[in-house]
Amino acid sequence: MRPTLAVATATAVTLVVSGCAGWGGGPGGGGPNSINVLMVNNPQMVDLQRLTAANFTADTGINVNFTVLPENDVRDKISQEFSSQAGQYDVATLSNFEIPIYAKSKWIAPLDDYVAADPTFDQSDILPPMTTSLSAADGKLYGEPFYGESSFLMYRKDVLANAGIEMPANPTWQQVADIAARVDGAQPGMAGICLRGQPGWGQVFAPLTTVVNTFGGTWFTKDWQAQVDSAEFRNAVQFYVDLVRTHGETGAPQAGFTECLNNLIQGNAAMWYDATSAAGSLEAATSPVRGKIGYVAAPVVETPSSGWLYAWSWSIQQASTKKDDAWKFISWASSKGYEGLVGSQLGWSRVPAGKRASTYTSEAYLKESSAFAQPTLDAILRADPNNPGVQPRPAPGIQFVDIPEFPDLGTQVSQEVSSAIAGQTSVDAALKRGQQLADDVASRYRERSK
C-alpha cells in the first residue's frame, strides 16, 4: 500500500542477525537453527533487527537472517519469491491486502494450528478487525499483525478554538468542509485542510476510497459491475476534488502522506484526514504541534464509520521447511512481551502498536500516547473490511478492493483524479476513463463466474 505506515530509509540493506549480530549479504544459508526473513525497511522493523539477536536468538538459539528492502522493492521480491515457491525465505512482511490473495494461491501457510498450540501468544488479544483482515475466504488465519492502523481526522485544537469552532466527535464530511472554509488562512500560509492528491492506489485513493464508501459508492457491485461513473462515486470524487482545490494545501496533486504530515507539523494546514499512525510523529517530543492536535473519527456521510484498515504482518511461505521456527519468530515479534521490550529499551512511543487490545490498557504506553491512543483504538475496532459501505461487495477491503488487479487499476484511475485536482481535467472526464479501466477488470471476473 503506501506510505501510510512510516517508511525509513530509501536504501536497501541486507542484515544478518545471529547470536552476535553483523552485516552480511543475502539471506544466510544458515543451518538447522536459522530462518530467513524478508521484510520492509520501516522504522519498526529496523528496531526489530536491533533487538533480535540479544533476545529472540539468545532465548531460542534460532539465528535470524534478515533481508530488508524499501517497500516497492520488497513487494516485488516477495511476489517473485512466493509465486515461485522458491523456499528461500521462511517469513515475510505482507499486508492485509496481499495476505488473502496469497492464501488463495496457496503461497502462504495457515497459522491456526500454531496459534492453537501456543496459548501464550493469546490470539484473543489481537484486535478482531486485524484477525478478520488477515484471514482468507476459507476461514483460516494466514498472518499475524506486527503493527496496524486505521484513519481519522486530525485538527489544530487551538486554531479551531480561536475561530469559535467545536469539532464534533463524529463529524460529517460536510461539517469538515464547512470548518475548512472557516479556518482557511487562519494563520499565514495555513490551508483549511490537507488531503492526499498524489497519484497511487495507496496514495490519493487510500483516503478517497473511504470517502467513496461513505458517500454510498463502490468500485464494483457484488456481481462485478463497474461503478466508477456512478452518481455516488462521482459525488464523492467531486466533493474531494472541490474541497482540496478550494481549501486544501499548496501542491496538492503531488501531496502524499509525508507531505501532509509535514504540512500539519509546520503549521501549513489546520486539519488532515489520514492514517492513525501519523499521530506518533505529531506528538513526538520534538514536534512543534505536540499537544495542539485533536483526533476524531473519520468523517462520514451515509455510513456509521469510514476509517480504513491496514497492517504490516508476518506470513510463512508454504514452501518453507522451517515452519516451526518461523512461527516461533512470529510469535515473539508480535507478542505482548516484544512490545514491552521495545517500550523498556527504545521508548514506548516506538512500540509497534495498533494490533493488541492489551497495548491500550498499558499504563506505560498510555502515558506516551494518551492524546491519540483511544481514538486510534476506536478507529481500528470500527473498521469492517467485509462491510465498508452501503452495498455488498465482490471482494473485501475498505480503502482498496482485495483483488490482484487493484494496484494497477487504482493507480491508473488515481492519475486521472490527480489531474482533476490539478485542474487539468474534469472529474467527469477522469471517471469516464476510470469506468473503462474498471470495466475491463470487472468483465474478466464476470467471464470467470459463468
Q: Which stretches of residues belong to each language-model region?
A:
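Short, low-complexity disordered leader/linker segments with a strong preference
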Residues: 1-36, 116, 428-432, 436-450
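Extracytoplasmic "Venus flytrap"/periplasmic binding protein-like
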Residues: 55-126, 161-164, 263, 267-271, ...
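Hinge/lid segment of periplasmic solute-binding proteins
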Residues: 96-150, 204-207, 294-296, 380
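Short, solvent-exposed loop/beta-turn-alpha elements that line the ligand-binding surface or hinge
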Residues: 112-126, 169, 193, 197-200, ...
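C-terminal lobe and pocket-closing loops
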Residues: 116, 278-289, 302-411, 449
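Extracytoplasmic/periplasmic solute-binding protein
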Residues: 136-146, 151, 174-226, 238, ...
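Conserved C-terminal helix/tail region of periplasmic/extracytoplasmic solute-binding proteins
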Residues: 161, 384-450
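Glycine-centered hinge/linker elements that transmit conformational signals in sensory
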Residues: 179-182, 222-254, 294, 298
